[in-house]
Every structure is written in C-alpha cells, then in structure tokens.
Amino acid sequence: MRGACKFLAGLPALPDKRAGKRGQNNKPMRIYLVVMDETQEAQTALRFASVRARETGGSVHILALVPRQSFNAFGGVQATIEREALERAEVMANAAAGNIFAESGRMPVIAVRPGSPQEVIRKYLEDHGDIAALVLGAAANGSPGPLVTHFAQHAGSLPCPVYVIPGSLTNPQVDAIAARGV
C-alpha cells in the first residue's frame, strides 16, 4: 500500500473543474450569486455578497428574474406586459450593479432571465459551475419568502452552499458579518 501512495503522490494533480477564474494570489475566484428583486431583503443579500466578494477577491453575479405572467392577455398586450417586466428587471439589476461598482470598483455580472424562479436559479447554477454560494435574503418579518423556503429545503441537492441573510440586519451588521466570513 505504501508504494501505491508514493506512486499517487508523484502524479500531477488533476485540474479542478469547479476552479473557474483566478483571483488574488492565483486562488480560485469565489463567485457569489445574488437573486435580485425590488425587496429590501434582496438589497441586504446583495450587500453581503459584495462585501464578501471584496474580502475574498471574488465577484458577484446578479440574477434578476422575470416570472412568467399568470394570466393571458391578447397577443400584443401580453407581449407588451412581458417586455415591460423584462425592462424593469434590467433597470433594477443595472442599478444594483452600479451601486456595487461605485462601492467596490468591480462590475458584477448581470443576467436577466424569464421563467420559473426556482428553475431559472437551478439552471444558472448548473451553467455556472464556479459559483461558490447562492446568497438569498430572508424577509425581516413573517415568512422568509418562497425562494429561501425552497432552496433551504433543497440545499442538499445544490452544487454550492446557500447563504440566507436575515433582512433585519443593519448595513453595519451585514458588513461586519461579511467581512469576517461565515
């Protein structure tokens, strides 16, 4: 058995398929995926991810979701409603990205995707194997929200950890937690 260990020790390491891009000190860049909407808890999650990315030499991906409309209007009206929802999501994601850039000097990756939120997020994680963590914000009061509930229940089947950031935290509290790591 010792000979086998010695033999294996002499082999070059296989490349890590999840290693992805390299950041500071040639370490794998940690990418934090934040699902953005117009809620305060999403803003809190984004703040956590941007501070954490700054501290780790990583980056942020912003995923803005455009849920399918639950009603069907006449063809042209339906297309207009869907286009307006897409434009609102793009404006919101770009505004959030601008805030991150203003604070950190690093521009996050922005993606706007239509569809079922859970399916879109799972597909994004599948397509971006270098995501280090999915960062979601929980509502300060009441239910944590459908995405937090869903992904907390299915955390064991995800390719990365899920960070749930309490919506009741103040900005200084979020900054302190993100700066020291979790």
PLM feature segments, named:
Residues 112-120:
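Charged docking surfaces used in two-component/phosphorelay signaling
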Residues 45, 72-75, 122-123, 145-147, ...:
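Short, well-ordered secondary-structure micro-motifs
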Residues 64-91, 172-182:
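Acidic, proline/glycine-rich short linear motifs
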Residues 50, 98, 123, 152:
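Active-site phosphate/pyrophosphate- and oxyanion-stabilizing loops and adjacent acidic/basic residues
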Residues 2-18, 126-182:
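Gly/Ser-rich helix-loop-strand patches that form or flank binding pockets
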Residues 52, 120-127:
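CheY-like receiver
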Residues 27-76, 157-160, 166, 181:
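Small/aliphatic-rich secondary-structure junction motif
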Residues 102-109:
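A short helix-to-beta-strand connector/capping loop
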